Every structure is written in C-alpha cells, then in structure tokens.
C-alpha cells in the first residue's frame, strides 16, 4: 500500500542441514533471502538484493533544466542576512546551480541588494536573463526590481514542482483565505537549525499570516523529525521546502495531510500569496497558474 520496498532475511541457516537448506532455497520468494552472518553464506547475494531495492528516480520533472536552454542566463538571488550560514550556500541554491551547469546554461548569483544594478548592466548590453530565481523571503523586493517581461520564480517553488508537490501545495494555499481567530496552524520545518531572532518559521511566517488574514490564529511549530502523525486538528499546515528531507519523508507528510483532509502548502507559495505575486511567481508553469 505504501510502496515501500522490502526484503525478508532468514539468518543462521548454518545451523540447518544441507538438505534442509536446499529445501528452503527451493521455496523462497524473490523478496526473501537465506543467509548466515557467522560464515558469510549468501551475504553477497543479500548485498546485491539490498542494492536492487533502490527505487528508480521518481521525479516527474527536472529541477530547472527543462525551463532553460544552453547558454541561457539565469540569475539566482541569494540574500545574505543573519540567518544565512557562514561561508556557504544552502542546499537548494547549490542544487539549482548544479542543475543549471548540467544544462550548459549560465548561472549568476547576486544578493538582492545588487540585483537591480545587475539587471540594468545586462539589459543595457541587450542581454535579457531567461529566468530569475529568488529566495522566497526576498520576493517582494525582487519582484519590484525584475521587469515584468522577465520570468520570476523561487527556489521553493522549483523544489515543490521537482518533488511532485506543486499542485497539491498550490491548492492548499486557498485555506489561508478562510482562517479565523483561534484556528490552529502548524508550521513545520525539516531541518533542526538553531533558531535566531527573525527566524522565518517562528517569527516571519506567523507575522505574514496575521497581517494577511487580519485574524489571530494559534501557531504551533515542529522541526526535524517532530512532524505529528495526527494533523486533523489543524486548519492548515505550512511546510518548508523540505530540502533536508528525503523524497519519501516529504511525500509521507503530504499524504498524512491529504488523508486527514488538512490543506498543506509551503513557505514559498505562502510568501508569494501574501505579497501578491503568486501568479507571477508561477510564470515558468502556466498550467499551474490556472489553479489559482
């Protein structure tokens, strides 16, 4: 039902007679293997079976490669604030750069403070970026700086599509318009970073939701592996992009919400909604614009 691959391993077959082992070997199914940890019997076969359990790449879409052509210019907007890690880019930014490189396109990484001058420089030379991808927190500022004829989206929205969740999470944002005082909202993050002043999950997200809805919902927060099995008491769930979670865990969390009839959306979609640029942020995906 869950589509989880498995093996049944029978150990200590060295304690059985040769004839008994032969009899068992004739009846084992494909997902069963007979081994002996003490003398190594069939251990290599076990390793090969474990390796064969690795699922094929289930991503329906690439991260960004299908949106660009070789030598296209893609500008990535990466704010450097108190929450940014020292000396490195975060995982979604790294993965996006790698995907652009594999396509043979050009990636240019700038801070939001240098974005306008960067765009002016290239446009003055007749070079128009194919796409601008921004950190969701800078959506409002970046949207004002990027001309309407240049496609704009966010890392969060790219990853939502990449993991096959964009349509579900777009539909989930509709719950924001029906929030009332006292409604419970779960804000969930996949990583366990040390929270700082102005943290997006515990500080900025609640403030954006209160300002947008003009209501006073009750916020609860989880991080890492704390995601509850029972989410039925929540009006909606707002999840991070899930870059630190594997695909199976993220799909499990979404399935929990769907099974219990609880709308789920993600940070990037919510930020785009409250800043009034959700439709524009879906520019690379016109089929998704029809859902809002």
Pin down the residues of each PLM region.
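Amphipathic, alpha-helical segments enriched in basic
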Residues: 68, 72-76, 184, 232
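C-terminal effector/interaction modules appended to NTPase cores
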Residues: 87-292
């Amino acid at each position: 039902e869950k589509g989880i691959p498995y093996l049944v391993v029978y150990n200590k077959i060295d304690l059985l007679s040769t004839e008994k082992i032969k009899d068992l070997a004739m009846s084992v199914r494909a997902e069963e293997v007979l081994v002996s940890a003490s003398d190594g019997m069939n251990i290599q076969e076990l390793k090969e079976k474990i390796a064969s359990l690795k699922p094929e790449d289930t991503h329906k879409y690439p991260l960004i490669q299908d949106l660009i052509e070789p030598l296209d210019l893609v500008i990535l907007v990466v704010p450097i604030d108190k929450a940014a890690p020292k000396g490195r880019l975060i995982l979604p930014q790294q993965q996006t750069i790698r995907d652009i490189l594999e396509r043979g396109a050009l990636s240019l990484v700038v801070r939001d403070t240098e974005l306008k001058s960067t765009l002016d420089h290239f446009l003055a030379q007749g070079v128009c970026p194919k796409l601008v991808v921004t950190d969701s927190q800078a959506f409002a500022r970046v949207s004002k700086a990027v001309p309407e004829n240049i496609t704009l989206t966010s890392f969060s929205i790219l990853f939502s599509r990449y993991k096959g969740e964009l349509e579900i999470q777009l539909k989930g944002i509709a719950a924001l318009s029906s929030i009332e005082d006292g409604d419970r909202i779960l804000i969930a993050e996949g990583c366990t970073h040390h929270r700082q002043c102005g943290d997006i999950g515990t500080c900025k997200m609640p403030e954006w939701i209160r300002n947008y809805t003009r209501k006073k919902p009750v916020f609860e927060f989880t991080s890492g592996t704390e995601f509850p099995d029972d989410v039925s008491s929540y009006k909606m769930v707002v999840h991070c992009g899930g870059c630190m979670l594997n695909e199976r865990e993220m799909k499990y969390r979404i399935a929990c919400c769907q099974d219990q009839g609880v709308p789920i959306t993600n940070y990037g979609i919510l930020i785009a909604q409250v800043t009034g640029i959700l439709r524009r942020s879906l520019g690379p995906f016109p089929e998704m614009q029809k859902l809002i």
